[in-house]
């Protein structure tokens, strides 16, 4: 995920929270409700999630090369913490760089486990995560990255069996990373097959993608997909329209294939939160963001909602209230209006990682900033929950921002919406 800025204050509150009777003690509505018809809305459930990132060992495992027992213990600790904080979902990254945290017939084992891509860690993290999450009354959303292959540009560093080495024609370097080329139909089919293997074999609750589609722009560099455009793009007005169609096809087809593979598994996407600025498109948000997903990532997030191709969207509204270029309140209101009437669930990605970071603006030094986000969200009828980035920041809680959220808004456990 793109988080551009990639403790002890909560210890007393966390220690006071009880963990007994977790699944059975869930209620159907939280005890704290705001205006905007919140009581009826939250009777349907409220998502309270946390991302567990595995790429580059961001959250888990804490380092590569730990024993299977140590890795499992760390994973269980994240799940137990989620229960103590009265969360009800974990979003677990299982395909970080075109590799896998399960024994996949399509892709090698992820290097975050052993330090060596393709090396068997001696256990099945996804199977364990699903079982242990469900035993605790938590949903398990399996988080996949469709196109990212590596956070470097040297194919020889990949496992010898990696599909990117077996099919070098699928891969493009850009911005210091390797990506699968979204313009190739065979790539689109392969990445779907690789992800659907997990859907078929594990009782996950949702397939979850983040904000990576075409890569974020890098000044002075071009994504060299001219050959694919010449071969497949003749029906489109320009390359940008063709690229958007490539991503549209991936999203639409994946949603269809998930439903065909396992009934009840939802499909959610957590994009960068600005579709387009109003200055670019009158239908856009009242923002001046430096990135617009429609134009820069070729991800027409608004279309996916309006077409009903996905079950939920979780925009990463990683700004504070009153932020000049992208005010949390304005972006939230835009998404609330965009989702209304579509039947697509709306959750909000929250930047817990910014709370207490001295490099961030003054509002992020206030432990109450995130709690104010949730208070505001309760006045927006479509908002049905929040996901916090990320697990290690939930654990550290530098200035008690997460503890404040729990104290103000999560006084009871509730079920996730279905």
Specify the residue positions occupied by each region the protein language model found:
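Substrate-binding cleft of secreted/luminal carbohydrate-active enzymes
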Residues: 312-322, 342-417
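Glycoside hydrolase catalytic-domain groove-lining segments
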Residues: 234-283, 293-358
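Glycine-rich, aromatic-flanked loop segments that form ligand/cofactor-binding clefts
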Residues: 45-49, 87-95, 125-171, 208-210, ...
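Aromatic- and acidic-residue-enriched segments that line the glycan-binding/catalytic groove
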Residues: 102-114, 148-174, 212-234, 280-289
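N-terminal secretory signal peptides and thylakoid transit peptides that target proteins
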Residues: 1-14
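Aromatic-lined substrate-binding rim segments of carbohydrate-active enzymes
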Residues: 96-144, 239-254, 261
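Active-site-adjacent "subsite" loops/lids of carbohydrate-active enzymes
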Residues: 57-69, 147-197, 295-296
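Catalytic domains of carbohydrate-active enzymes, especially glycoside hydrolases
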Residues: 73-98
């Amino acid at each position: 995920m793109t988080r551009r800025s990639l403790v002890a204050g909560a210890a007393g509150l966390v220690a006071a929270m009880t963990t007994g009777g977790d699944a059975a003690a869930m209620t159907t509505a939280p005890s704290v409700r705001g205006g905007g018809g919140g009581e009826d809305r939250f009777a349907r459930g409220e998502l309270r999630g946390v991302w567990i990132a595995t790429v580059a060992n961001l959250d888990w495992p804490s380092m590569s090369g730990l024993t299977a027992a140590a890795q499992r213990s760390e994973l269980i600790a994240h799940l137990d913490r989620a229960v103590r904080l009265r969360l009800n979902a974990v979003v677990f990254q299982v395909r970080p760089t075109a590799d896998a945290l399960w024994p996949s017939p399509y892709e090698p084992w992820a290097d975050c486990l052993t330090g060596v891509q393709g090396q068997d860690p001696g256990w099945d993290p996804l199977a364990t995560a699903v079982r242990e999450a469900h035993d605790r009354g938590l949903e398990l959303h399996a988080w996949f990255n469709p196109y990212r292959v590596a956070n470097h540009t040297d194919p020889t560093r990949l496992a010898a069996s990696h599909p990117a080495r077996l099919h070098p024609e699928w891969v493009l370097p850009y911005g210091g990373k390797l990506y699968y080329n979204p313009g190739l139909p065979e790539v689109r089919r392969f990445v779907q097959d690789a992800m659907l293997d997990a859907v078929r074999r594990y009782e996950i609750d949702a397939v979850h993608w983040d904000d990576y589609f075409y890569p974020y722009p890098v000044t002075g560099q071009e994504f060299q997909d001219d050959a694919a455009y010449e071969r497949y793009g003749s029906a489109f007005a320009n390359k940008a329209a063709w690229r958007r169609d490539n991503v549209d096809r991936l999203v639409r087809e994946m949603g269809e294939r998930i439903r065909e593979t396992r009934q009840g598994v939802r499909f959610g996407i957590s994009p960068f939160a600005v579709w387009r600025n109003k200055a670019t498109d009158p239908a856009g948000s009242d923002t001046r963001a430096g990135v617009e997903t429609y134009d820069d990532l070729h991800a027409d997030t608004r279309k996916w909602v309006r077409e009903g191709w996905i079950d939920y969207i979780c925009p990463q509204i990683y700004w504070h209230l009153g932020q000049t270029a992208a005010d949390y309140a304005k972006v939230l209101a835009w998404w609330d209006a965009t989702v209304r009437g579509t039947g697509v669930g709306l959750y909000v990605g929250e930047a817990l990682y910014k709370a207490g970071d001295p490099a961030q603006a003054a509002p992020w030094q206030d432990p109450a900033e995130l709690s104010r986000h949730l208070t505001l969200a309760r006045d927006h009828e479509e908002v049905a929950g929040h996901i916090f980035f990320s697990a290690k920041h939930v654990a550290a809680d530098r200035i008690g921002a997460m503890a404040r959220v729990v104290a103000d808004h999560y006084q009871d456990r509730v079920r996730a919406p279905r």
